[in-house]
Amino acid sequence: MQVVHTIAEARRARAAFDELGFVPTMGYLHQGHLALVERARAECPAVAVSIFVNPTQFGPHEDYARYPRDTARDLALLEAAGVDLVFIPTVEEMYPAGFGTYVIQPAADEVLEGAARPGHFRGVATVVCKLFNIIQPTKSYFGQKDAQQTVVVRQMVRDLNIPVEIVIVPTVREPDGLALSSRNVYLTPEQRAAAPVLYRALRAAAERYAAGERSGEVLRAVMREVLSTEPLAKPEYVSVAHPHTLRELDQIGPEGALLSMAVRFDQVRLIDNWLLL
């Protein structure tokens, strides 16, 4: 496994491969990340992973400085998973003095995570675009857990004619339903016991949908009701949206819907979603 830190090194290393699967990460890897790597390994002759905690996607009062990091552990996991190339740039390598070009999708900033975290998707789209230009993968793998991110990346690839296939991998969950996230490490034991309420709320709405309910407001109410059973859970938003535009739905049509939510447990903010088809 080759580990590189500069863009020039990454490009030289990339030249050794024909087809390449790519998994961009912020490190502190868990089984969800490894599921992306496993899928890439199954579909591509070589796999690259990036580890970069991207400052431009964090707001001024968010957790950039304390975001968990453990590069040695990450590298051991990636080597065991059969990864060929790991790119670990510094902030200065990715954003040198004078950097001033960003990828912006105004529509993404108006809804869900974009509305809750101003500037977040400007940072996400910009760093993913840069990584695609540096690594030039054949396919790139993203988790369904970050549903809006997958929509943003797919639109960017389409709009900017970036020659990469985007592959979305289902969310990996704990046995009690909690979606795997690097931020779960912040949860106290009491918060961790309460956190599966997100999954229960989504599942309850999905069951109502399966039984024939098509009202967006009814399904939002179902999710809020389940969340209200957990005193530690403070919902930031609860959404029933179109799966492509992410606009809120009054009635769910033939294209289905994306159920999603952001919930705070004191300082810890968790997101989760469920795709209704």
From Swiss-Prot:
Beta-alanine binds at residue 57. It is found in: Cytoplasm. The active site is at residue 33. It comes from the Bacteria. GO terms for molecular function: ATP binding; pantoate-beta-alanine ligase activity. GO terms for cellular component: cytosol. ATP binds at residues 26-33, 143-146, 172, 180-183. Pfam families: Pantoate_ligase. It is an enzyme of class 6 (ligase). Its EC number is 6.3.2.1. GO terms for biological process: pantothenate biosynthetic process. Belongs to the pantothenate synthetase family. Catalyzes the condensation of pantoate with beta-alanine in an ATP-dependent reaction via a pantoyl-adenylate intermediate. This is Pantothenate synthetase. It comes from Chloroflexus aggregans (strain MD-66 / DSM 9485).
